[in-house]
Amino acid sequence: MKKTKNNLPFDPNGRIFQWGPVPGKFFFCSMFTAVHYKHFRAKYKENWSETLWLFLNGRMFWVNDLNDIQAAGVKVFLKYLLPLKTHKKIYKEWQGYTAKLLKLHKNIDTADLTKLTDTQLKKMWVQYHNTYRDFWVTSSIPELANYGSEKYLKEKLQAIIKNENELMSAMEILTAPTRISFYQEEEIALSKTDNIKKHQQKYFWLKNSYAGTEILPTEFFAERKSKLNKNLETEAKEKIKETTAKKIAIQKKYFLSPEIMAIAQAISEGVGWQDERKKYIFMILHHENVMLEEVARRFKYSTEELYRAWYFEIEQIIAKKNLHAKLKKRKTGFGVRFFHTCKELNAQETENYWQTYETKVEKHITETKGAVASKGKTTKSQGVVHIVLDPNNIGSFKQGEVLVAPMTSPEYIFAMKLAGAVITDAGGLTSHAAIVSRELGIPCVVGAKGSTKVFKDGDAVEIDTVSGTVKLIK
């Protein structure tokens, strides 16, 4: 691991990549943490850049040096996602692991876990997580590639499109996915079904996240069905046709080469793959939690204790190892710093890193600037700010408000559907906020650093989707 002044992994005043802070529990993230520093490199001979992964007061915060993560992303993009044959081979392999997980889900659903012996429970846990590890190793390709591919495409286009606004508009169109998202898939299915109970059994996991799981009742789906547009499927298909036509128009307008179009297509496919992956992750989180609750019951742990454990530590608990003291130490804060190896961080180290890298803003600042991810219907729009730090707590969010968040993930979808515009502290043109805002046709500015601190609930703001500025209206 590299060192900067004061043994910091990255220069706090340099170019920093942040994911979060958002609600989350370490256990639900522990598999991909292990994959990112160890298993991914073992299979693909490439690795994530040095990372801080911090957990404090129910929230999680991921930090990288931006130049490093982009460089790592470009390598993986060029090696594994851009070559069509390689991309298809890895995607097919991932589909195989997904199919295995779905079979294991049926086993978990039909088993009475309380009647399994410790040996049987351990076997179930290990088999499940070995497959889940393989699922994550292969599907980390589009995620890591995403962090470098956008910059790579932009550099190619800059030689052709000199106007910055035209460049960003072309980027927005070229990187847009051309397949229906899993939330659209669920809404279309809901709009067409007459069997709400069957639909609930298929999609009960819809609001799961790394912060926790819940089983949604039939009432949740029945209420939403009554408000759905009956033409959802037709409109979604028309939107995809429109997106495809816009890509062709951009290619013709700027005489873009097949090479550039292939780069854009690979990025678009990677974004779609990540969305599909998230659907399965939500299902996986449920089944992990079902097994975890049995471990908690059987071995006299609280589930909150186990949410601070690595997935492989659960196997140790089943083998009768006492981890109460170890997990208690993580209660007030826990983190990891990893590259080729992984160092666990205590509460004090975690808090110090958090304070060092969390975005700070001057009190007099009344404007932020980011990348325009979706123009919406007009180049300038106004609205009232509603800051959402927890996507599972949006009860007071009103139709037409401006959603301001650290970043968005699929759990934010229900607030985004009400929003008049979306502003995020972090993210790029291929981020979740960007993709969903385009689907909804609302203005979106991503990577507007510090927005959740500059603005407060009730502020009136103006969003300029030409310049990417968000201004407080006095």
Residue positions per predicted region:
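Non-catalytic, soluble scaffold/interaction modules
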Residues: 1-474
